[in-house]
């Protein structure tokens, strides 16, 4: 019987074989998984985030950091998806130079204005003023806080402080 899972757009395609849609590119699999067939999911692992960029998910999983989806070589474990890692993601008009995801070394503090809607605590960037070099300064959700002072994020409410916080305060 001819396999109809190319592409698998309807449930009738999955009578003899299942198919998995990786972004917009369907692939045939030999056995049915625990999840329903023919679902437009990027990864088998439940911890993989939805892929916003179709080109990211041809052969890899993807994870969204800030506003940009990032391709990774393998699916993460469920425990890692709630913890942001250092990925080279550009936020707003400035590109923060983080180290690669998965490295044990901590991110180098950078000075960029965070304009993402919900910036993740990726590289702990300081203020626009490079004199604010303390690694404990949290990402600045409010750009107005970062012109001459540092800001500390408490939950989702940023507050401006008059000077850089000490490493013990964050």
From Swiss-Prot:
Sequence repeats lie at residues 8-12, 13-17, 18-22, 37-41, 42-46, 51-55, 61-65, 66-70, 75-79, 80-84, 85-89, 90-94, 95-99, 140-144, 145-149, 150-154, 164-168. Keywords: Keratin, Repeat. It holds the Pfam family Keratin_B2_2. GO terms for molecular function: identical protein binding. InterPro entries: KAP (IPR002494). Transmembrane segments: none annotated. Residues 8-168 are annotated as: 17 X 5 AA repeats of C-C-[RQVSGE]-[SPTQ]-[TASP]. One of its GO terms (cellular component) is cytosol. It comes from the Eukaryota. Belongs to the KRTAP type 9 family. In the hair cortex, hair keratin intermediate filaments are embedded in an interfilamentous matrix, consisting of hair keratin-associated proteins (KRTAP), which are essential for the formation of a rigid and resistant hair shaft through their extensive disulfide bond cross-linking with abundant cysteine residues of hair keratins. The matrix proteins include the high-sulfur and high-glycine-tyrosine keratins. Interacts with hair keratins. This is Keratin-associated protein 9-2. It comes from Pan troglodytes (Chimpanzee). The gene is KRTAP9-2.
């Amino acid at each position: 019987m001819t396999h109809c899972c190319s592409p698998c757009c309807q449930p009738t395609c999955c009578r003899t074989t299942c198919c998995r849609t990786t972004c917009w590119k369907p692939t045939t699999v030999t056995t049915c998984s625990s999840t329903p067939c023919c679902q437009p999911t990027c990864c088998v692992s439940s911890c993989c985030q939805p892929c916003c960029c179709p080109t990211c998910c041809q052969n890899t999983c993807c994870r969204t950091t800030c506003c940009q989806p990032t391709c990774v070589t393998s699916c993460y474990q469920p425990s890692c998806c709630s913890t942001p890692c250092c990925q080279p993601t550009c936020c707003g008009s400035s590109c923060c130079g983080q180290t690669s995801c998965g490295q044990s070394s901590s991110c180098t503090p950078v000075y960029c204005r965070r304009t993402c809607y919900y910036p993740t605590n990726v590289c702990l960037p300081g203020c626009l003023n490079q004199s604010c070099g303390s690694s404990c300064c949290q990402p600045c959700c409010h750009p107005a806080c970062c012109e001459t002072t540092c800001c500390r994020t408490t939950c989702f409410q940023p507050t401006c402080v008059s000077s850089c916080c000490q490493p013990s305060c964050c």
